[in-house]
Amino acid sequence: MTAFAGKAFVLRVDENAAYAEDSTLTSDLSFLSSHNVRPILVAPNASAAHALVRTINRAGNSAVGLAGADAAMLPQRGSGLGNIQPGILETLTQNGYIPVVQPTSFAPFGNDAELHPDEVAQAIAAATDAIRAIFFHVLGGVPDPKTAALIDELTPAEALELAADPRVPRDLRGAIRAAALGVRAGVEAAQIVDGRVAHVSIVELLTQQHLGTQVTGSVYVTGD
């Protein structure tokens, strides 16, 4: 685990995992924090973010809920997300806090807007140089459109191809695309897993086992 010390670790949590009564998420977060890995959670919506903050804090950790307007973290650009400002995330994680981000933008003029949590998680992972980006999905990974068997590993190019395949469930395509773009932006690896599986957040760090689908491979980091 020493190779991951001081690194950001982004978890895109879905509603199934956020409200699971027997979830090991809080103990996984404690484990990561105890090894100086810096988790950042992206919730599916505001109510799930509030629930996660309560659950994490009741377990003895220190979680802080954030919206996109906090420190202008998630600036709105057109109808989407602009270049994020990760300073507040870095300040919190460096001081032992676990940020829980709700996917809302900051609009300097007009109303803030809802953002897609997969897009937010990918952008945060890239901006914080995260060692991992984990996307929770009830399917537990990416099924092969031809056989329905879960795919163990994909390159970013393969993942982007599947993200455009209409045979793949629509709500999974966003996670696949975000995982691929995160890796292309410099994240070492991204996983799509079922967040309800025990210790799914950390098993890949400790073993060579993939519990879902991993996206890794060529990295294309582009400058501003």
Question: Across the structure, where does each feature detected by a protein language model lie?
Answer:
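C-terminal catalytic "cap/lid" subdomain
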Residues: 1-224
